[in-house]
Swiss-Prot record:
The active site is at D42. Glycans are attached at N23, N64. One of its GO terms (cellular component) is fungal-type vacuole. This is Invertase 3. It is an enzyme of class 3 (hydrolase). Pfam families: Glyco_hydro_32N. The gene is SUC3. The keyword Glycoprotein applies.
Length: 74
């Protein structure tokens, strides 16, 4: 009985790991926000709009370089 529970638990973990490994952008974090390209400053201004049912996250962003510099966008 204990062995069956362990195998069931192990199969569940294997399925989750498999799903994570099939991520098309495996070199990017799966939990933390990152821009598609460029540099971003620390995120701030996270808020939930209950009317729209959406989360909003604000950060400084430079799409043209991987370091801080102008132009910066919000």
């Amino acid at each position: 009985m204990l062995l069956q529970a362990f195998i069931f638990l192990l199969a569940g973990f294997a399925a989750k790991i498999s799903a994570l490994m099939t991520n098309e952008t495996s070199d990017r974090p799966l939990v933390h926000f990152t821009p598609n390209k460029g540099w971003m400053n620390d995120p701030n201004g996270l808020w939930y709009d209950a009317k729209e049912g959406k989360w909003h996250l604000y950060f400084q962003y430079n799409p043209n370089d991987t370091v801080w510099g102008l132009p910066l966008f919000w």
